[in-house]
């Protein structure tokens, strides 16, 4: 049987047929490209955008730059020795789980999404995203080295913890499915055949895009739900004036994760609005799957709360409150991406209202000499200064 001959009909298509490249030398109008699976990118220019929101998120992430060494953990080491066994269990278990999550996110966006990104502003946004996740992972090492006499007792037991491994599977399976499918697509001739509208190749790309949707949706759930039981526990220690340095670091991490959540929410909402008509259709078809994934995450976090408090609660926090909090958070995350809230809890009834000032650093008012100021923004400039802005100031 003679092999099928594919005629490449135009210069534009010939450019695409070259496949993935680190620098596309052809002119590309990125304002007309979808967010993913468009033409390869060339010049990294940040003066004109299809979606300015991604550049804004890049600027915000860079403005929030911080290092864990800025926060003293001297008091935390002493505090840890005074914790009851059940409190040590809560503190250490959450730390191990957060290490796993940020190990995934430290390499996930760069490994999975960036190679197929076709907008420079989104590419930059995700590059900074991965960099900030690396800071989070370094922060956990900083905490562990300062709190525990033997860091290996934490690190070496993460991948032997069945409860963490169960949740790791939920977190990573969609990532891995997309990475495998996209690499298979890129290493075959399917991308070339797709230019000639060959049906099998078009279906192949549709399958890859479906896996991309599932990966992004799962990351949205990770950033928006899976961290928050652990966050709440860290903040509860801080409210009790225990492990305050750790709570401050986790507060900085939570602030960053809100930025990363916004990245995934914007990607999903722009697909829903028609950035790529094929992705818009995939989103509709995958709606039931998305609800199932949200429900799976909520149930896993509820079981985690049971595990954390199996030996006792702490002042201001218990497993039931945490489980209500997870449902409240999940409803907000669903609504933010155009889906219907699924849990019977009022949007105005935050079960843990005191966590909000830890998540939003603007709510923290502290004297600089007493504790680390975490509301400082690097490179922040106020652009709307008027003649009367300082009218109330007196010298």
Provide a role label for each language-model segment.
Residues 2-395:
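Non-heme di-metal
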């Amino acid at each position: 049987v003679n092999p099928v001959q594919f005629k490449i009909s135009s210069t534009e298509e010939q450019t695409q047929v070259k496949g993935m490249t680190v620098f596309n030398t052809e002119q590309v109008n990125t304002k007309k490209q979808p967010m993913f699976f468009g033409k390869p990118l060339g010049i990294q220019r940040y003066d004109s955008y299809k979606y300015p929101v991604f550049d804004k998120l890049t600027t915000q992430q860079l403005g929030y730059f911080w290092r864990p060494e800025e926060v003293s953990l001297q008091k935390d080491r002493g505090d840890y020795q005074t914790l009851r066994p059940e409190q040590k269990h809560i503190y250490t278990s959450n730390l191990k789980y957060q290490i796993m999550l940020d190990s995934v996110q430290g390499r996930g966006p760069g490994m999975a999404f960036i190679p197929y990104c076709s907008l420079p502003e989104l590419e930059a946004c995700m590059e900074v995203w991965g960099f900030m996740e690396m800071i989070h992972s370094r922060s956990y090492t900083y905490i562990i080295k300062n709190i525990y006499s033997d860091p290996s007792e934490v690190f070496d037991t993460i991948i032997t913890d069945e409860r963490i491994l169960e949740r790791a599977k939920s977190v990573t399976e969609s990532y891995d499915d997309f990475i495998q499918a996209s690499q298979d697509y890129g290493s075959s001739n399917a991308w070339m055949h797709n230019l000639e509208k060959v049906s099998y190749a078009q279906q192949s790309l549709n399958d890859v895009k479906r896996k991309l949707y599932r990966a992004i949706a799962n990351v949205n759930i990770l950033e928006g739900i899976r961290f928050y039981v652990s966050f709440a526990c860290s903040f509860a220690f801080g409210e009790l004036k225990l492990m305050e340095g750790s709570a401050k670091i986790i507060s900085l991490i939570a602030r960053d994760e809100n930025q990363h959540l916004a990245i995934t929410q914007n990607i999903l909402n722009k697909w829903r609005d028609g950035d790529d008509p094929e992705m818009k259709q995939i989103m509709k078809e995958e709606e039931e799957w998305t609800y199932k994934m949200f429900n799976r995450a909520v149930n896993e976090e509820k079981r985690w709360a049971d595990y954390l408090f199996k030996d006792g609660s702490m002042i201001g926090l218990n497993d039931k409150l945490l489980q209500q909090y997870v449902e409240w958070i999940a409803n907000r995350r669903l609504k933010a991406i155009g889906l219907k809230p699924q849990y019977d809890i009022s949007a105005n009834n935050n079960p843990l209202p005191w966590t909000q000032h830890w998540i939003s650093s603007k709510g923290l008012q502290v004297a600089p000499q007493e504790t680390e100021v975490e509301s400082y923004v690097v490179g922040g400039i106020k652009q709307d200064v008027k003649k009367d802005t300082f009218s109330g100031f007196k010298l």
